A protein has these predicted regions:
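C-terminal catalytic "cap/lid" subdomain
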Residues: 1-219
Length: 219
């Protein structure tokens, strides 16, 4: 069984399409083994506000932000019908194998292995890539609130969607975190960036292997 690791960005929690996305994931999980990695969302934004207000160490902010992912994960687990929270790959495999979505609460696992730099350059994008590498996944899906990666700021009228790119082009692209390229080189999996405000695109990708979005070729 090959797990698809799918990160649901925290930005999804600010849009009314989140329930429809969760319903689509619950349905897709019946046919495709899914491990959902949560973003941080409003929970991580609270950590950022604390870091702006107080002299938090990089390590404190790092672990607080990962605990924020656990919180968002519990929210997603409550909204994805039949899903279960998990804290390791060993817990995820049997749940996904039963046609239910496994939702990772990553703090305990990451705390035990501490595999990534303690920096705001590392977000849930890179964490999801690390998880995909550990799972031996063929595909990582980053669900965001834009159609994919662009050659300029998405709000710019001249911005063009990048349909396909090499992982070497990721550094400097503002749509993902700065550490993602390194994490993907180590994970060696195909990556897609898709818009979760259109749940049908996520379903199409899982079913057919392609949709509107950006495909990042594995390094």
């Amino acid at each position: 069984m090959n797990l698809t690791v799918l990160k649901v960005g925290g930005s999804q929690s600010r849009h009314e399409e989140l329930p429809a996305l969760c319903a689509a994931l619950a349905e897709a999980g019946k046919r495709h083994p899914l491990l959902v990695v949560p973003g941080g969302g409003d929970f991580a934004d609270g950590v950022r506000r604390c870091a702006d207000r107080y002299p938090l160490s990089d390590s404190a902010a790092h672990w607080m932000a990962i605990l924020a992912m656990d919180q968002y994960g519990l929210l997603l687990c409550d909204m994805i019908s039949g899903s279960r929270p998990v804290r390791s790959l060993d817990e995820a495999a049997p749940i996904a194998g039963e046609g239910r979505v496994a939702v990772l609460l990553p703090h305990d696992w990451l705390r035990g292995e501490d595999p990534l730099p303690h920096s705001w350059d590392v977000t849930s994008d890179a964490i999801a890539a690390w998880v995909a590498g550990r799972a031996g996944s063929d595909r990582l899906v980053l669900v965001k609130d834009v159609d994919g990666l662009y050659d300029a700021a998405p709000a710019s009228p001249d911005a063009r969607l990048i349909d396909e790119m090499d992982v070497s082009r990721l550094p400097g692209n503002g749509g993902v975190d700065r550490y993602l390229a390194q994490a993907l080189k180590e994970a060696a999996c195909e990556t897609w960036v898709v818009n979760g405000r259109f749940p049908e695109r996520v379903a199409q990708l899982l079913t057919t292997g392609a949709t509107r979005g950006t495909r990042v070729r594995k390094g």
